[in-house]
Amino acid sequence: MAHKKGTGSTRNGRDSNAKRLGVKAYGGETVTAGSILIRQRGTSVLPGVNVGKGKDDTLFALTDGIVKFESIRRGLRNRKRINITATA
């Protein structure tokens, strides 16, 4: 017989690191070319004028300017699009 109580085992105890997703530059903010605007999984926000899309769906500014969000009708649902209006 055992003199000590055996330790139990568990299948829990794991968690993934936060990925820091979300909007990084809001409407009306001034950004420089290359600035990250939104980190996202999938294209919940579509790239518009002067906005590029990375391979992980990150949206970034192609030129210096001011961030502007707009809502567009795409099929049966409304989508958001982000544009950069260039500053002179």
Swiss-Prot record:
What are the start and end residues of every segment in region (Disordered)? 1-24
Pfam families recorded: Ribosomal_L27 (PF01016)
What lineage is this protein's organism placed in?
Answer: Bacteria, Bacillati, Cyanobacteriota, Cyanophyceae, Synechococcales
Q: Provide the leader sequence positions.
A: none
Q: Which PANTHER family match?
A: LARGE RIBOSOMAL SUBUNIT PROTEIN BL27M, RIBOSOMAL PROTEIN L27
State the Gene Ontology terms under molecular function: structural constituent of ribosome
**What are its GO biological-process terms?**
translation
User: HAMAP family from the xrefs?
Assistant: Ribosomal_bL27 (MF_00539)
What family, per the record? Belongs to the bacterial ribosomal protein bL27 family.
Q: Which UniProt keywords apply?
A: Ribonucleoprotein, Ribosomal protein
List, alphabetically, the GO terms of the cellular component aspect: cytosolic large ribosomal subunit
Q: Does the keyword Hydrolase apply?
A: no
Query: What's the protein here called?
Result: Large ribosomal subunit protein bL27
